[in-house]
Amino acid sequence: GCNLVVSHHPLIFKGLRRIAGSTVTERAAMAAIRSGIAVYSAHTSLDSTMGGVSYAMASRLGAEVERVLVPSELQFKRISVTCPRELAASVRLVLLDHDAGTEPCSDNSSLSPTAPVADTDSAVSYYDCEEESLPKSPGPEPGVVDIRHTALTRVEAVVPAWKCAGLAASVTEIPGAESAKIDILPLDNQPANLGLGVLASFPQPVSMAELADKIKKEFGCRAIRVSAAYAPDAKVRRIALCGGAGGEFIGKARSAGAQAYISADIRYHDFADNRSGMAIFDIGHFESESCAKDIFYHVLTNKFANFAVYYSEIESNPVKYL
């Protein structure tokens, strides 16, 4: 009876030119379409968000995240809407509907649905008018008319840069907000907790042998590949982790001072070129991302109490070990 499947790895990883049933992917897409089932896959987004796959990997091993290994280049901006006080609640709701103010570098204090509206300084708006459009009631001196004292409110939020245009358009669609002043401002303090991989540390050092055993247990690994720097009795406290194929970040992990790097799909030459004392653990692509279902289940059951959410027990690792 389900009508939505949520997955980490996308059903359609490469673009389809047709859906004719000639490949496994095409047949799966056809089955979903015929059954009216939507498929939502959070792949790179779940890899790079705070609390995503790499965070969950560290949590499984009992390590505390210190920071992101490779910070995201996604740019954020601050959108500021100055409008009459009576429109502030409507503006706030529009921003909330677009998930504004939930970004890591925002305290979202101005977007709490029940937060009191905070006025800017009591503003005096001067409207310059052409001579022929002057109101009948003159102002205090020639050429200056219609001096209005209006209580204004400024509503602000931090949003990804790509959302700004759509947000601004939505605000102007609010009845009465056509003339609202909308400023989109750059940020110097870009979020540092979004990106790929994490650097984490254990409360107490563990041996590499203990770490290997824990990896096998927590991620269900039949086997793991390790680099020449692996020494069973060597102690490890700081580790770097990256779910999925993380070979390109070996240098980042080494520069960050990690004593062990846990990822997947490490190439032969990456193992051969690693001349440092940092040990590399290749635990398998599927295994490294096995915590994704836990993340989805936790988010959905906590946010949507009235949804029937089923945790699939089907494991579909395409790699088999002999």
Question: Positions of the model-derived regions?
Answer:
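Hydrophobic structural segments
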Residues: G1-L322
